[in-house]
């Protein structure tokens, strides 16, 4: 998987490159050159997966050859295993039409844990 800049003049990079680079050298954002597609069967097969396993499955096409799929799964399990709730980000029904996604079960009790616990581990790779 290659990533290209939204401004068009930075070199295309793989997942490892964009993870370390952050913003593109031309000031743009890196986006996938092509968006991965999941079939209805693949999506159905993800139903009921633990959060960490689901995260790894969805991320794998974006990661491509930058990281072995088994290693990605280990990292997602390590990152989200630190959360205080088994569902990681439980969805709680408040009433008939309102739901609340709880993003505060990470180690710092902040929404940013959902992304940054894994990102720190990816930097170490």
Model-derived regions, located:
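PLP-dependent amino-acid enzyme catalytic core
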Residues: 1-125
